[in-house]
Amino acid sequence: SSKGLFSKVIHQSGGSSLTNRSVREAHLALGHVFAQQTVGDDVDDPIRAMRQLPADTILEAADTVFKNHYFDAVVDGHSVRESIMDTLRDGKIHAVDLLIGSNDDEWLMYTGDQPDIEGWLDAEVARSSVDTLHAILADEIDDRRKLDLLRTAKYYVCPSLVLAQEVSNVGRRAWVYHFTRQREGDLAATMGAYHGAELPYVFDTHDDWLPTVEADHRLTKVMQSYWVNFATNGNPNQSGLQPWLPFKSDSRKIQSIGDRLYSSEHPSQPLCAFLSPT
């Protein structure tokens, strides 16, 4: 059990862990194929045999067998006994304070120039919800951005809000952020507030592949103050900082962190009525 091992949680762009779709049987089948390709079928202990192989052999086979496969936690009945959503439904999460959030464009840089919105909706959303989702996004004319909003909401925003609500329900404080800062320049414009964009601000590790201007340094100081305050006290607020309201079931306030700092409902909240994990 992990109970008592931590007193607070900072969870950045991690909402997808609530909705992982890894199936044990599928992993076992891939493992069998992997063993066949590396050591064959006529081996009593394939794992031991694979451990004797050169690393290059293992990597070459993995590139073939696990191509396009997404690794995630698998409910195996031993180390992982149930899905996170089952834990939430049963009210068994640890009562600790939570700081959680995601970025405005988590999926934009991974979206091609001809996004298949209808294909994604067919695969990911109940048919009865499709027309309403189209209506919610009717004002968005850029199809790449539209698919980015849908993916970011389903895989990051909506699960994060579900977890924040459950933390609030068990009597602890949840603080939700929405990171919106886009760097200056043409390259940054193609990515927006991309997956991982908040990390240089949290750790003050700005690299030179994107421009860093005075506004970025100011935001770094603000975010580091929020994060350190939370790690210390379970509350990101302090005198002199823009107030950050806790997330609650009745108010659902999040903190927008970017060129402006302010509290509001998450702009993707309407999408979450149809895209939240259940």
Language-model-derived ranges and their functions:
Residues 25, 124-127, 131, 193, ...:
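Alpha-helix N-cap/helix-start motif at coil-to-helix transitions, marked by capping-box chemistry
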Residues 127-170, 175-181:
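Alpha/beta-hydrolase fold catalytic core
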